[in-house]
Amino acid sequence: MTEFDNLTWLHGKPQGSGLLKANPEDFVVVEDLGFTPDGEGEHILLRILKNGCNTRFVADALAKFLKIHAREVSFAGQKDKHAVTEQWLCARVPGKEMPDFSAFQLEGCKVLEYARHKRKLRLGALKGNAFTLVLREISDRRDVETRLQAIRDGGVPNYFGAQRFGIGGSNLQGALHWAQSNAPVRDRNKRSFWLSAARSALFNQIVHQRLKKPDFNQVVDGDALQLAGRGSWFVATSEELPELQRRVDEKELMITASLPGSGEWGTQRAALAFEQDAIAQETVLQSLLLREKVEASRRAMLLYPQQLSWNWWDDVTVELRFWLPAGSFATSVVRELINTMGDYAHIAE
């Protein structure tokens, strides 16, 4: 399995280095739910500003404040501890007066707004995230500037970031140990983290191998293609290749890569053979996903940061702004720009 730091770069390995997350204020994330609260219902949606707090810690503190079970507090996604983040949490508080959230006191955390909502906020139920990042101590401004232009046009690999695999790859190591020991894992969080890490690592490996090909973004017979911004996909046939290639070139369609698991992968013929060969040696992780009945799915191979802009504060400091769809990683954008330095460059929650 290729380590995250050695996965193929779309625009070649960066020439220079830089500092990511010199302090939490250098990594700002604002959740975009894509909808507004209903204004009624048994749930309460809260928009929370946090600095130096991980999501689970805040959710548990909120549950304690509301005197409800921790499982009654949900969120759409985990957010980095070592960052300034605005995210939505959801608490099930039926048939009660609206609590006085001004009394909710937690260091590094502030409730910005809240409203009633009819439905529980589920994991992944957000449109995307807006990022404002500051990269410092950049050693090669010209190279970074060239890469930013290239990313605006050509995107970046849609890799799962190193955070997905835990500090020092602990989640992936946990998955491997679990697969080899065949021992039951009763901790639901561990199961979720480990299975997610296993499937993400296999996806990254498939994308890594495809990007080695000079014609990586050329549609081949049996590719699974996705309408940009949509979750469903369809299979390319040889008769349609010219027209499908035109639509891929115009970014109307996206070539996808497999999130392996049980059931059909989605690709067929030449494309399926390539994906199977790309992870043929990773039998342990594939067996784990089959054993645990994790359903196979698809994910776009490339990621195009939206609303990308940048501002050089000086020759060694640049501020980046961009928006990514849910499930995509800002660190996968940054790795195409610089070789990152800093204690928190890849740290997970």
Swiss-Prot record:
Family: Belongs to the pseudouridine synthase TruD family.
Gene: truD
This protein's GO CC annotations: cytosol
Matches recorded under PANTHER family: TRNA PSEUDOURIDINE SYNTHASE D
Amino acids binding substrate: F27, N129, F329
SUPFAM superfamilies on file: Pseudouridine synthase (SSF55120)
Native species: Salmonella newport (strain SL254)
Domain TRUD: 155-303
Main enzyme class: isomerase
Keyword Acyltransferase listed: no
Catalytic activity entry: uridine(13) in tRNA = pseudouridine(13) in tRNA
GO BP term, pick one: tRNA pseudouridine synthesis
EC number in record: 5.4.99.27
Membrane spanning residue stretches: none
Xref: InterPro entries: PsdUridine_synth_cat_dom_sf, PsdUridine_synth_TruD, PsdUridine_synth_TruD_CS, PsdUridine_synth_TruD_insert, TruD_catalytic, TruD_insert_sf, TruD_pseudoU_synthase
GO MF term list: RNA binding; tRNA pseudouridine(13) synthase activity
One Pfam family from the record: TruD
Name of the molecule in the record: tRNA pseudouridine synthase D
Alphabetical UniProt keywords: Isomerase, tRNA processing
PROSITE patterns: TRUD, UPF0024
Active site: D80
Protein role: Responsible for synthesis of pseudouridine from uracil-13 in transfer RNAs.
